[in-house]
Amino acid sequence: MYEVRDINLWKEGERKIQWAKQHMPVLNLIRERFKEEKPFKGITIGMALHLEAKTAVLAETLMEGGAEIAITGCNPLSTQDDVAAACAKKGMHVYAWRGETVEEYYENLNKVLDHKPDIVIDDGCDLIFLLHTKRTELLDNIMGGCEETTTGIIRLKAMEKEGALKFPVMDVNDAYTKHLFDNRYGTGQSALDGILRATNLLIAGKTVVVAGYGWCGRGVAMRAKGLGAEVVVTEVNPIRALEARMDGFRVMKMEKAAEIGDIFITTTGCKDVIRKEHILKMRNGAILANAGHFDNEINKKHLEELAKSIKEVRNCVTEYDLGNKKIYLLGEGRLVNLACADGHPCEVMDMSFANQALAAEYILKNHEKLEPRVYNIPYEQDLMIASLKLKAMGIEIDELTKEQKKYLEDWREGT
């Protein structure tokens, strides 16, 4: 079963998938093993991820491992219709199209759950949220889940703290081979890529304000600086603010940054990072972009209330005319890298989705002894993925000698 925009788009989607596959060597190795061992035979996996080419490679990997796949998007604007069609053509149950309404978005999540999955793979926790609220009749069938992103992990840990979480979830986001690369290098490149594609403007010479200095914010600030921008960071955490300053960036409150910024990029995972009092202080022509999971980091309601007129001036660019100035919002305030571009680079998602595939296998093999809480990815898995990635890149590294290992384990040898 499938509900996509146009199944006839599948050939173009397949071309994108094949291109991504060529640049995802770690996941390819896992797929070959899954194809032979069929660990997911008889298992249904429900997925809510950004439905584009790299995600399709992950879904295909799980399918090769014997799984029945039911998949939808995790954001109304991130699905690529040709890729969704290609996934449907492969025999997956696909319910997704770009430009879904909020109602359609949740209907599609529910359609995935109608397949009664044994394992869920989520990005943002909306699928898991539904299971714990409106689809509780399915909980007994769930072995466990995997969560991809920072925003979802924040929600899951809040659920765990309240005792509301009913099954184990693997924290893929905090794997070293995920957040150190996906969040930093992936978001850093793809967020700027989305802004450049949407606006066709020069970054050099502009003041770019980055809200949040977690791994995503670090990456965005680094890439904006590399393109010639003056970068300002806003933070609520004094340690991260200090780190940003030591990294060479100006640090100030958003109310001050609002007065000098040309481009604003939110990377916090929190709501109302840019709101009315900030918008009122912004320059004419200020550009707002969000690189966080949900579309509430920039308060769109405040923009709408302040605007005398609203119109789309370019694909992915909405102009809010406040009378005395114009403010531009990219991608409707949703993930700029996916709403306005193709998301993270293939090589980065290779590691992230290798973690997802192996985390799903870990759930399958260990669910009976796992408690209903959030679990970290095993460190051995991180090391294996990093080693495979280095090998694919043609890089060799040193190994400790026996004497070095002994030295590191012996407390007696000192000065």
Swiss-Prot record:
Keywords: Cytoplasm, Hydrolase, NAD, One-carbon metabolism. Substrate binds at D123, E148, K178, D182. PROSITE patterns: ADOHCYASE_1, ADOHCYASE_2. It is found in: Cytoplasm. GO terms for biological process: one-carbon metabolic process; S-adenosylmethionine biosynthetic process; S-adenosylmethionine cycle. Pathway: Amino-acid biosynthesis; S-adenosyl-L-methionine biosynthesis. GO terms for molecular function: adenosylhomocysteinase activity; trialkylsulfonium hydrolase activity. Exists both as a homotetramer and a homodimer, in a 4:1 ratio. Belongs to the adenosylhomocysteinase family. Catalyzes the hydrolysis of S-inosyl-L-homocysteine (SIH) to L-homocysteine (Hcy) and inosine. Likely functions in a S-adenosyl-L-methionine (SAM) recycling pathway from S-adenosyl-L-homocysteine (SAH) produced from SAM-dependent methylation reactions. Can also catalyze the reverse reaction in vitro, i.e. the synthesis of SIH from Hcy and inosine. Is specific for SIH and inosine as it is unable to either hydrolyze SAH or synthesize SAH from adenosine and Hcy. This is S-inosyl-L-homocysteine hydrolase. The lineage of its organism: Archaea, Methanobacteriati, Methanobacteriota, Methanomada group, Methanococci.
